[in-house]
Structures are given as structure tokens and as C-alpha cells.
């Protein structure tokens, strides 16, 4: 018992026990040191795990100065470090079965003092600040202190094994497929942003070499695990058929072949594994009293140092996934897993039907991995049972070769994803074919399951395999794909799908085309592949979408069938050709003939199918063109109908726009007084205004009322005005704009009275005013009928005399060059004629004058106006005044017979001025009306012939000549408008104007030679004619007049000379 007792606690570095009650409240100092020289009687020494060869770390704790909260935190920290120490101890124990590693917590002490606590209850602290120094890796401790602290002959064996690992790594580095794995994967450069989402623990050969050179690997097994992790990451991320996937598989096989020789050299011992308890029971291992700890240490001193193998640590994500899988199996929970969890929770005595509450965080990693394995086995068995009754549904993804679609990384015990490949280069695409059903053999499924299970168990030590195990529970319903293989592994060609797993199991699926045109080819292919284990592929018409179930008579169905025939024909023909080359060996000549026939048949079949496809395409194109043409025609018809409807609508709108007119009238009616209506200006101008307005429905217009009075407008009637003014209704300029229209109406109208009442109504009032201004000669002196008859008897003599005088006027007018100017201004001629006619047609004079007298006055006034125009052009104002004064003297000297003479002169003037044709066309009824203005000269001539007998023939000739002279009078009358001021002066003189009218044609001839004297002679002639008429001496006076006319002609020649000068 005198020997020093050995203590094997099996705790790794970093463990800090709870020593709050094991030490005294006084200050203490401890240190741990590893003895460099191994001696049989090991003594208690002080050493630290965090110490090195150059110094010793110390920590001074004063328990008396610690508060209760600080002590509680210290206990919690030590419990966490305890688990870390245990994990490190298991890694150290995995070096060799013959190696005995001394625990750093040897119960060695420098003194036997009772106050000294055991070294295993102490923790390692550095610095006075109370911060924990990170633990040193176990491999460094082994390299630096292993030879000095261990006197074991197997230590050199571990070093030699690591040397061989380095040699194997160099061989992998120089391998032809090893270049992609030399450096870490760069997701940015390779454009694979999801790399770290799939690969949780990346690794590469460059990192492994760096760790190996630094001595960070504590065991060759860690080295092998990192190498396997490098290749498994590449296989998991890259889909089958990818270049890097294939390279990873090849170099992984190369590594496994070299690792077998190294693995045999590693001394391994598998001590009995004691299941670890949950972390909830760790508190019981921490001594709260010194006595129980010493009893435990005494019990362990008799046993050899126990070494536990290293294990992997389950990450938080894996724990979470495991918990989700367990919750998913709540209804059908496996009994084995329930028993294991019941043992760990300490509820062994409970019945199996009770609920189990488990905290996954409280369980150890070893228990969690055991639960994970049991769960995977259960899910695998469940999947096998479901596969026996359910077929898997899959789609043909690509035409040929391997699939380039992204596949899920291979995970653990889950079956590796498989890809279906149809041999040939012209396979239909995904959108061209419905899903297909494949029923697999049970034996094949068993082989796949066993293969995947073995692969999962083989790589169970890697982190990638453990990570993939957590996702196997979610894929239990159906198989989505099958394992793809390279073309080199397809040793049995044919029409079908080849699937190989682990180079042993294969499955061949023959394509059975349902098209009628390829039945013969399918029979041939079926005969060639009778030795295959075939499963027919049938289109799933029941599960196909509705759009794919097309009626057999539709053009789309025929085009679809032709297209599929063409596609499947190429695939099956190529497969058949391959099968033909693999046929039985026979006569070469026979084979050659069969090959030629087969190729010929293939070409014919292909041409036929292509022709059918082309015909179907052409028919489809024609149908499409016809449909487009039909749609175009319908569209044109719709547009035409819309256009017609628009036209009808527009026409309706035009008709309805008349409502606005009535609305406007209603508004005007509302704004006026009671019973007042507001007509428009157009209605006021209309002659039928009253009649139209009487038919406007509710508008009751008074027929005898002026519409302007409803607007408050009244016309002022100034009858007492002395001067002639423009008519109130029509301006003088408007009348002058249409001069010839009025004269034409006078000539051609049979009812002159009615026409003049409408057209020259404005002139009646001025003429009436002139009549009033002329004094008693016109208004105050009634005409005696006897005098009128006497004057008519004297008219033939006067006409003959005047006719001779008119010859002189014709010569004077024709000799004047100024007549051209007068013609240009002929537009203004109508006004004086209208004025004279208005005066003669005035209602005031109709009551007092005979129609013949009024007619004579009109013609004489026209000639007077011509005379005024000529006189204004030849003489100045002073000469005109002298002549007018002479006329006034003669008028004043006249006696009561002046009225009679005026009547006679007016009658003569009328006969000379009025056009006989005008008189004939105007009115044939001279005797019936005094208001008719067209008293024709024919009636006057007829009366003269009755009275005068044979004198009528001679005078009629003179009248014709007078008419020719009067035809030129309008040219002279046009000058009246240029001298409106002079005319106004003549009209104002009253009596002077009447005297001028009496002068007749003679005043026109006397331009510059004493026209006043000639006027006196004319007046004397009037008196002489009256006397001759009374005495019957007519012929004598006519002869005298002829002589006087000769004198007047001479005077006219003098006038021509004056005008030329």
C-alpha cells in the first residue's frame, strides 16, 4: 500500500471540476506539470494543461471573498468544461490499444498535508483577470510532450503511420484527377452561390497538407476523415455525369486502395463501450463533498486506464432535424427508439403506452446518433414495404446522354438519385410526352436498398454522411429518379433504359410505342431483346392533363401523331441498328444482305414518316391561314356594320339639332314681356314673316304688328323735313348698287304698281316730301280735265317741233367725248329715275294729277337732271345762279295760266322722255287707273290721230326719231349722281325746278349760249301753241318752229366748238 496510487479519470484537457466545497476558504496556489522522465514510482507533481516548457501557470482563488453568484457561475462554467475534457480524452485513447496515457490529473502531491485538495478537483486559470486560456490541442501535446511523458514502445508506430499518411497525400496531390481538389472551392469564381448551402463542411487537399505539416492531426483516422470529406463534398454537390463528380469517384477509389495498407498498421483496440448518460445526470458526477469523490477514486485505482474511442459531435441543425423527424412519426413511433429514450430519461418502469418527454439538448451526441441510426433503419424498412405495391412515376427528361438537371446531393442512407436515359439522339422532349410508369422488380429494389445501406454505413464516420441522414425521412412516398451512369458502363445496348448500381445490378426497360405505324418495328425490336428483363412503358392517358387528350379526328391530333412517329422512329431505328450489330454471328454475306435490306427499309420508313409529318404541317398551315382569313372577313363585316351604325347615328343627330332652335326661341320668349316674342333678323327681313310666325306653335305673333316694336325699337317718321335724306330702311348706296335691276323690273313687269310698291317703297316718302315742297303748283292746284284734253290736242304739234329739236341733241351728244365717262358711272343712274318716278307715283299726287301729267313730269325731271349734269360740267357756279335768277323772274311774271302751261309742258316732256315700248309693255289699260304709271304713248297718238287726222303720219315719223334721240338720254342722265349737291339745290328751289322741267329737250341743247333766253322762248312757244290750238293755226306754228329749230342747230354747233376748246 506504500506505492503511489494511480488515478485514471478519463477526462480531457480543459476540464474544471467543482471544488467549491473541496477546498478550504483560505488562499491556495496549485500548478500542474508533466514529468519528462517516466519512473515506476510516480510522485505527485503539480503541472498545468495550459503550461509549456518555459513556465508554469498559476491561479490564486480566495473562496472566502467570492459571493454566492460568483460561485454559482463558476460551477456552471466547470460543468461545461467537463464535457470538453471527456471528448478530448476519447480522442487521445484512440491512438493505440497498447498505449497507456497518463491522465494529467494524477493524484500526486508534494506533501501529505491534510489541507491539500486532490488535483483532479482543480481547474486551470491564467491571469489575474480571471479569463480562461483556450486549451491546447491534444496533438500538439502529443508531439511536444508525448515522448517525454510516455515510455511506450508504440509511440514510434503512430509517428510512422502519420509519415505514411503524408506520403499518401503526396500521391493524391500528383494524381491526374487531383488538381481540382488542391485548393478550396471559390463560389464566386466558379459562379456557384449555393455551394455553402449544400456543403456545410468544406475541405480540400491543401488544407489537409497544411494541418498535417503543423501536426494538428492527433490520429491517422482524423486525416482519413478529412480526405474522405473532400471527395464526398464534390460527389454530393456535382450531379452524376459531371466531370468533377467522376473525378472525385476515381480519386476516392484510389485513396481507399492506399489507405487499406496504412489502416492495418494502426494499433486499434475496442474496449467495451459504456453508454453515456445524459447531461442532466452530470451534476451527480461533480462531487459536492470530498468523501464521495475519494471513494470513487479508490474504486478506480484498481482498474487499468480505460480509453474510449473518439466520436463525432452532432450539430445544432442535425439535432433540430432529428427532432422534426421524431415528431413526424408521433402516430407510428418505432418501439426501439421509444425504449432507448425511456432508458435515457430514467422512466424504465413506466408502461409503453405512456408519453415520453425528452430534451434533445440534454442527450449526449452518442445517444443522438444511436437514435438517428434506428430512425433511418425504420424509415428504410417502411420505404421498402411501400415500394412493393406502388409504382414510381417519372418523366423522360432529355433526349440523350446524362441529365443536366440539378439533382439533390446524395445524403446518407437515402437512395441515390437516378436518371433515365433513352438510347438514341432524337428522343422527344419533356413537353412532347406524358409521364410514364415503371414497375420495378422486388429483387432490384432490394439490391438498391442494400447497396445504399452499405454505402451509408461505410461512410458513417464523415460529417457529410451524418448531415445527409437527417433528410431521409421526407422522401418516403415515391422515387423521383434513378441513378445515372456513364456511357462506358452500358454494356448491353438496346432499345430501353439501362440503370446500374455498384457495377452489379442493372435494369433494362423496353419502349413500347403505342403508335400504329411502328408496330412492326416494335415486334422486331422485341424479338431482338427477348433476353432482357423488360418492363413495358405505357403512356398514362388517364392521368394526362385535359389538353393532351385530343380527339382523334382533330388536325392537331394528326399533326401530333405524325410528329411523334418521326421522333420515335429515329430513336427506335438507331436502337435496332445497334441490336442488329449485336446479333448472332453467322454468314458474313448473309449479314451484309440483311443489313442492306434493313437500311433500305429504315430509309423508306423514315421518308414516309417525314412525308406524313410534312403533309400534316402543310394541312395545319392551311387551316391556320383559312382561320385567319375567316377572322379577317368577320372583322371587316363588323367594321362595316359599325360604320353604317355610326352614319345612321350621325344623321339622327343632325335631325335632332333643330330642337335647339325652338329652345332658343323659348328663352327669348321668357326674357320678353307678356305675350312678346323675339323674332330673328332673318324672319324680320322675310316678306312672309307674319305668316310664318303665326305657325310657330305656342308663339302667337300679331300679324299687323312690327316685330321691332317687341324689342323696343321704333322707326321715326319725319314727314315735315325740308331736305331729302336717305331712306330710313335702305341706304342710298344700296339702291345704287342695283340700278338696272329696278329699271328692268319696270319694263317687264305687267303690274308696275305692285312691283314699285315693294321695291321703291322707300322712295315714296321722299317724293311726297318734294311734292309738298314744290308749293301750290302741284298740291294746291287741281288739274282741270278740260285743260288736259286741250293740251292733248296740242301735243302732236309740240311733238313734231320737239322731234326736230331732238335731232340737234343727238348731234351734240354724239360729238362729245365725255360720254364714255358717263357710261362708266351708269350704275348711279337709277337713283334720280327712282326719285322722279317716286315723285310721280306718290300717293299724294295720285289724288291730284292725271296719270299722263305724272308721266310727263317724270320724263321732264329726268331731262332736267341731265341738263343740270351738262351745265355743271360746262359753266361755273356763278353762271348757274344767273340762269336760275332769270328762270325765277320768268316764273314770277307768269299769271294764273302758269298751271295750265306747266301741264302742257309736262305733257310734251312726257311724250319725249317716255319710251313708247315701255309704255306699251307696262299697261294696256290707260283709261282704267289713275295710279298706273305706264300710260302708253300709243293711246296718246291714237287720240291725236282722231283729232288731227292726216297730221298723225307726219308726226309719228318725228316721234320715231325722238325715240332714237331719247335712247341716248340715259348716258347723259348717269351724270346726275356725280352732282348730287347741284341736284339738291335745284330741288330746294321748288319753282325753279318746275321751270327747268318745262324747258324740256331745248335746255339740253343750250349748254353755253344763253340757256335762260331759250328757256324764255320755250315758254313763249308754250303760249303760242296754246293760242294756235285755240285758233286752229297749227300748221303755221309748226313752220315757225322749224325755222327756230334751224337756229338751234346752229347754236348746237357753236356748243360743240365750245366743248372741244
UniProtKB/Swiss-Prot annotation:
Positions of the UniProt region annotated as Disordered: 32-56, 106-152, 443-518, 538-558, 606-645, 710-1033
Keyword hit for Coiled coil: yes
Gene Ontology terms describing biological process: abscisic acid-activated signaling pathway; cellular response to potassium ion starvation; negative regulation of DNA-templated transcription; response to abscisic acid; response to cold; response to salt stress
Tissue expression summary: Widely expressed in all tissues.
Superkingdom classification of source: Eukaryota
Biased composition (Polar residues): 940-949
Cited PANTHER family: TRANSCRIPTION FACTOR GTE10 (PTHR46136:SF33), TRANSCRIPTION FACTOR GTE8 (PTHR46136)
Biological function: Acts as a negative regulator in plant response to changes in environmental conditions through the control of ABA-regulated gene expression.
This protein's name: Transcription factor GTE10
Gene for this chain: GTE10
